[in-house]
Amino acid sequence: MSVYKYKAFKSGSKVSRLIIFLHGYNSCIEDVEPFAEMLLQHLDNTLVVMPEADTQSERNPLKKQWYALVDVDPDRKRRKPETPTDEIVEIYNRTGPRISETAKKMNAFISSLQKELKIKNKDTYVMGFSQGAMLAMYVGLTRKYELGGVFPFAGIVCGKDMLEKEHWVSKIVNFKNRKG
């Protein structure tokens, strides 16, 4: 049984590429479904899987979140234009243990799909919007083997202290210094 409830959208007759698309904070699968349809218009033999977070949103009981934010930013400073960037980064850094645990679950979910579909890491991509983008980046940085790509929309790398503790920061440096 899957760790997450999800919807899957397919193009072509044989799946040779897997895209995991992660919704944002205070969102759900239905909010991002149109993106799957747009992607599949341009990609053959692709399966787009949209898992839904398993935690109810703190802001809206009808929506979901990948991990809690209210207690690390009760005043919602991260949303205020006057908040300095370094303070916003620190707010998201405090989510490290939560995003780390969520990334472990997501990595297990992705690995189980890859095994079931016989899809390799190089043919697996993770996309996300907002909190889903942050999770996508963390997943990409913490997988044992490199993915085909990570495509974040409107997110930052968060949980820096946790990445350092888990020894993943060198992966970021190596990625930034890659040629080609």
Task: Write out the residue ranges for each language-model feature.
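The feature captures the conserved acid-bearing segment of alpha/beta-hydrolase catalytic domains
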Residues: K7-K10, P152-G180
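Short hydrophobic segments within beta-strands
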Residues: I20-L22, M127, R178-G180
